[in-house]
Swiss-Prot record:
<protein>
    <recommendedName>
        <fullName>UDP-N-acetylglucosamine--N-acetylmuramyl-(pentapeptide) pyrophosphoryl-undecaprenol N-acetylglucosamine transferase 2</fullName>
        <ecNumber>2.4.1.227</ecNumber>
    </recommendedName>
</protein>
<keyword id="KW-1003">Cell membrane</keyword>
<keyword id="KW-0961">Cell wall biogenesis/degradation</keyword>
<comment type="function">
    <text>Cell wall formation. Catalyzes the transfer of a GlcNAc subunit on undecaprenyl-pyrophosphoryl-MurNAc-pentapeptide (lipid intermediate I) to form undecaprenyl-pyrophosphoryl-MurNAc-(pentapeptide)GlcNAc (lipid intermediate II).</text>
</comment>
<dbReference type="GO" id="GO:0008360">
    <property type="term" value="P:regulation of cell shape"/>
</dbReference>
<dbReference type="InterPro" id="IPR007235">
    <property type="entry name" value="Glyco_trans_28_C"/>
</dbReference>
<dbReference type="GO" id="GO:0051301">
    <property type="term" value="P:cell division"/>
</dbReference>
<feature type="binding site">
    <location>
        <position position="164"/>
    </location>
    <ligand>
        <name>UDP-N-acetyl-alpha-D-glucosamine</name>
    </ligand>
</feature>
<feature type="binding site">
    <location>
        <position position="194"/>
    </location>
    <ligand>
        <name>UDP-N-acetyl-alpha-D-glucosamine</name>
    </ligand>
</feature>
<feature type="binding site">
    <location>
        <position position="289"/>
    </location>
    <ligand>
        <name>UDP-N-acetyl-alpha-D-glucosamine</name>
    </ligand>
</feature>
<dbReference type="GO" id="GO:0009252">
    <property type="term" value="P:peptidoglycan biosynthetic process"/>
</dbReference>
<keyword id="KW-0808">Transferase</keyword>
<feature type="binding site">
    <location>
        <begin position="11"/>
        <end position="13"/>
    </location>
    <ligand>
        <name>UDP-N-acetyl-alpha-D-glucosamine</name>
    </ligand>
</feature>
<dbReference type="Pfam" id="PF04101">
    <property type="entry name" value="Glyco_tran_28_C"/>
</dbReference>
<comment type="pathway">
    <text>Cell wall biogenesis; peptidoglycan biosynthesis.</text>
</comment>
<dbReference type="GO" id="GO:0050511">
    <property type="term" value="F:undecaprenyldiphospho-muramoylpentapeptide beta-N-acetylglucosaminyltransferase activity"/>
</dbReference>
<keyword id="KW-0133">Cell shape</keyword>
Length: 352
């Protein structure tokens, strides 16, 4: 039986692509383990899946000054030692890393054990963790073809983004029943990321009187961001977040308004949902979401509304443009074949 160790964490985006791949390897009887941090989101997600999970020390890698920068390099070194010992015991045939700060010690620990390491980079430019890790990797899979110019050409394999199978299996009838929506108006699903987005939430709520004339709204507003005064508003449903219901919600969704995190927007792409993308600004991120969104706009998948331009008027304008040009967007979206991503990655894992 072949063995594989997965790693990646710090945010859900560094875990969900692994969840898209793991079931396919389970079908092929791979022995699967996961190495992550002691308290990261990856621990909660992976343990729910019943996959053996091993914790290591980890320190955050920062591009800015912080007093924790003094302590964290020592935590990374401790993490490398922890990972080295764990990998030596597990004896995997290959390691698959999705990035995030916890992945660096695992990648180095794997390299020291002479285990082939495969990376996956979701964004147009590599994050700091993958920038460090790629020198220890034999291959790096990229979601965007444009990402290749930022990486060693001999290691790069373009795959697109692996999408979880359950996202593609939503039931329209269940979605309508869950939300209490009618079939008569189009549905817009609005997502601000796992923590929500204050400006998006406020603007959407200000725009509701106009939007609800033509659309039904599902608003995933993030933890602590519900507006109690809108709980019973007809045609509007708000949630902090959803889990098992998301595929059914997406099944009835006509348009999406979202941040531009790579994993989420590739799920919308695979489901052929036209998008208004509101990327995180350069002041709040390293600018990767802006590049992601602009790439989707160039390919005709989405319309980009920059954070600094978000107003009630601009939001409604972008939604109307999406609605009026729906067929044009659908034609572009149909050209993408999301199923090839997992097949390509599985093939290279098997050959490692």
């Amino acid at each position: 039986m072949k063995k594989i160790v997965f790693t990646g964490g710090g945010s859900a985006g560094h875990v969900t692509p692994n969840l898209a791949i793991i079931p396919h390897l389970q079908e092929q009887n791979w022995d699967i383990s996961y190495i992550g941090s002691h308290q990261g989101i990856e621990k909660t997600i992976i343990e729910k899946e019943g996959i053996p999970y091993y914790s290591i020390a980890s320190g955050k890698l920062r591009r800015y000054f912080d007093l924790k920068n003094i302590k964290d390099p020592f935590l990374v070194m401790k993490g490398v030692m922890d990972a080295y010992v764990r990998i030596r015991k597990l004896k995997p045939d290959v390691i698959f890393s999705k990035g995030g700060f916890v992945s660096v010690p695992v990648v180095i620990g794997g390299w020291l054990n002479r285990v082939p390491v495969l990376l996956h980079e979701s964004d147009m430019t590599p994050g700091l963790a993958n920038k460090i890790a790629l020198r220890f990797a034999s291959k790096i899979f990229v979601t965007f073809e444009e990402a290749a110019k930022h990486l060693p050409k001999e290691k790069v394999i373009y795959t697109g983004s692996p999408v979880r199978e359950e996202v593609l299996k939503g039931n329209r009838e269940k979605g309508l029943a869950f939300l209490g929506f009618s079939r008569k108006k189009p549905v817009i699903t609005i997502m601000g990321g796992s923590l929500g987005a204050k400006k998006i939430n406020e603007t959407v709520r200000e725009a509701l009187p106009e939007l609800l004339k033509k659309y039904q709204i599902v608003h995933l507003c993030g933890k602590g961001n519900l507006d109690e005064s809108l709980q019973n508003k007809e045609g509007y449903r708000q949630f902090e977040y959803v889990h098992g219901e998301l595929p059914d919600i997406l099944a009835i969704t006509d348009f999406v308004i979202s941040r531009a995190g790579s994993n989420a927007i590739f799920e919308f792409l695979t489901l052929q949902k036209p998008m208004v993308l509101i990327p995180l600004s350069k002041f709040a991120s390293r600018g990767d979401q802006i590049l992601n969104a602009e790439s989707f706009e160039r390919q005709g998948y989405a319309s980009v509304l920059y954070e600094e331009d978000v107003t009630v008027k601009s939001l409604i304008k972008h939604v109307e443009e999406l609605n009026q040009n729906n067929e044009m967007y659908k034609t572009a979206l149909k050209k993408y074949n999301g199923k090839e991503a997992i097949q390509t990655i599985i093939q290279h894992i098997s050959e490692a």
